[in-house]
Amino acid sequence: MKRHLNMLREFSIPLISGVIVALVWANISPESYQHFDHDRNFGPFSFHFIVNDFFMVLFFGIAAAEITQSCLPGGDLYPLRKAVNPLLATIGGVVGPVLVYVVLNALMGDPSLLRGWGIPTATDIALAWLVASLVFGKRHPAISFLLLLAIADDAIGLAIIALFYPDPNLPAAPQWLVLVLSGMGAAALLRRGNAQSYWPYIILGGGLSWAGLFMAHLHPALALVFIVPFLPHPHREKKHLFEEDMRDLSPLASFEHEWKVMVDFGLFLFGLANAGVTFGSIGAATWLVLASLVIGKTGGIFFMGWLGRRLGYPLPSRVGGKELALVGLIAGIGLTVALFVAGEAFTDPARQGAAKMGALMSAGCAVLALAAGRIMNVKRIT
């Protein structure tokens, strides 16, 4: 049973299932879908609010834990020189899509769509890892390169959400951010007091951080991003991303181990809450987002990875031009975070739906990457 559940997680079946159910529901009965998703059917809360502002706290908390672990000695982003080329590629993978989006939008002459520039900046780590494993094989050095890039990519994505996408309906109230600082202070004191359970950090520090972001009209989903780095952890990281060290019982590792499964399966709810757009929603924003992910990611990552090599920061062994181009194409799968940002970037339902369709259609990068891998005869290492 456990093997089958792990297979479902590995192939991102919960997220994909949620997306499919939402798409079918929204296209068969859009009124009932909107009622379920946005009306206050759960006391004072809507299903959409519960998923995006409560459940996604854990999703971004797990992302913060993975980034924190990767920055420890022995982790994938330590020391810095080891990660220079992937980090340069990350810059290309963020700047490239933004440039494509801004230039295409200028050519289209629709200033109202400019706010969506942040949608194509992040990569869906889980789906990218799955596709890369199918293209390269699980032991190919290109996998580690892609995951390093995706981790840093997500860190930038979190910063973009926090800084550039406040609630457009409510003015920011930065005075409430003192609660976020209080939460961080509480977490620091707990760590100094050697609290060896993650619960006090999450409840006290996370609770204060969530309240501060909510009252400041920012994104409470990011509450644990400010708290998780304070969780006690070993001095060295012994495993790579998606590898579990069952001997690591630190609060940081325990938080990730105990919540990652629930988060992976809970992504069904995220897909259900955010992917319900009608096929008639396809519009200018769809093609802006899709082109930015496919062209901007591929071109940006390829160019900066090539430039890094020219500057003396080598690519991993067995990663040449064709592998680098495939990594860029796979990184164009922007499903989860892109859907989240699309929901924050636009309040107009038509523009929001069109942008979300672009994020959903970016899953087609998987098909393109699999086909390109065959055509270019990429050697798989299993």
Curated annotation (Swiss-Prot):
Signal peptide: none annotated. It catalyses: Na(+)(in) + 2 H(+)(out) = Na(+)(out) + 2 H(+)(in). Belongs to the NhaA Na(+)/H(+) (TC 2.A.33) antiporter family. It is a multi-pass membrane protein. GO terms for molecular function: sodium:proton antiporter activity. This is Na(+)/H(+) antiporter NhaA 1. InterPro entries: Na/H_antiporter_dom_sf, NhaA. One of its GO terms (biological process) is regulation of pH. The chain crosses the membrane at residues 10-30, 45-65, 87-107, 116-136, 145-165, 170-190, 211-231, 252-272, 275-295, 326-346, 353-373.
